[in-house]
Amino acid sequence: MSPEEIKSRVGSGLLSFPVTHFTSDYKLNLESYRRHVEWLSGFEAAALFAAGGTGEFFSLSPNEVGQVTRAAKDVSGEVPIIAGCGYGTSLAVETAKIVEEAGADGILLLPHYLTEAPQEGIYAHVKAVCDSTGLGVILYNRANSVANADTVARLAEACPNLIGFKDGTGKVDLVRHVTAKLGDRLCYIGGMPTHELFAEGFNGVGVTTYSSAVFNFVPELAQRFYRAMRAGDRAVMEGILHTFFFPFAALRDRKAGYPVSIIKAGVELAGFAPGPVRPPLVDLTGEEREILQGLIEASRR
């Protein structure tokens, strides 16, 4: 899939990022992962992110990222697979090459590891990854890697295969500056944790799609909310926010790392076997799983 084709697909609807499935001893469980991705592919996702943040990219080796990407491609059918990529420049370039060989349709470039960096450093890092691959690349602005609008514009001019900008900062002024400066040169994706809580505001500044974590286990609900957002149906949105997303977010916020752990718990409650999260994350308690089960059941009424 060409960079322009993946750009068009990404901007056409709701996105999600399957959790990575592990065995009880933390090894990849690709058979279980394939079953889950195949199921998700039947719910009209515009694209799926393999080994993204919720897919525990930070705990995977480059070779494991390649294995996960290939497994997703095996079963996703017409749904494009965008692979996670990140860490320092040399590791990011290595991972980009691995996932391209594994059949990825695009790359989500997650933040570089740990250290802060000036704009010139972020520019050099992103450009090196873009130059290393023929795949379309989406820049994920969050945490310690936040490119300003001028840097994004320079990258868009220098890198024809930079096709998207995903925001995880929640800084609407920065996002608006980027969208005003770049226009339709890029596609724009909302990437806040439980982005449904931010979707209406981001939609107002031209970010019309986002990646939904809960799509992992309640895809019909995620699509219903997304369609209501696009249609401007605030009554439907408000209802879903109050019955599901607000209490879900309260449960998610109980511990650091739970934005990933709670999704894995939801996937298990949906009938799959995603296994535990890898350390240093921890799984939900039994009581918390019961609360989540209640929210899922209430969302279906």
UniProtKB/Swiss-Prot annotation:
<comment type="pathway">
    <text>Carbohydrate acid metabolism; D-glucarate degradation; 2,5-dioxopentanoate from D-glucarate: step 2/2.</text>
</comment>
<protein>
    <recommendedName>
        <fullName>Probable 5-dehydro-4-deoxyglucarate dehydratase</fullName>
        <ecNumber>4.2.1.41</ecNumber>
    </recommendedName>
</protein>
<dbReference type="InterPro" id="IPR002220">
    <property type="entry name" value="DapA-like"/>
</dbReference>
<dbReference type="InterPro" id="IPR017655">
    <property type="entry name" value="Dehydro-deoxyglucarate_dehyd"/>
</dbReference>
<dbReference type="GO" id="GO:0047448">
    <property type="term" value="F:5-dehydro-4-deoxyglucarate dehydratase activity"/>
</dbReference>
<dbReference type="Pfam" id="PF00701">
    <property type="entry name" value="DHDPS"/>
</dbReference>
<keyword id="KW-0456">Lyase</keyword>
<dbReference type="GO" id="GO:0008840">
    <property type="term" value="F:4-hydroxy-tetrahydrodipicolinate synthase activity"/>
</dbReference>
<keyword id="KW-0614">Plasmid</keyword>
<dbReference type="GO" id="GO:0042838">
    <property type="term" value="P:D-glucarate catabolic process"/>
</dbReference>
<comment type="similarity">
    <text>Belongs to the DapA family.</text>
</comment>
<dbReference type="InterPro" id="IPR013785">
    <property type="entry name" value="Aldolase_TIM"/>
</dbReference>
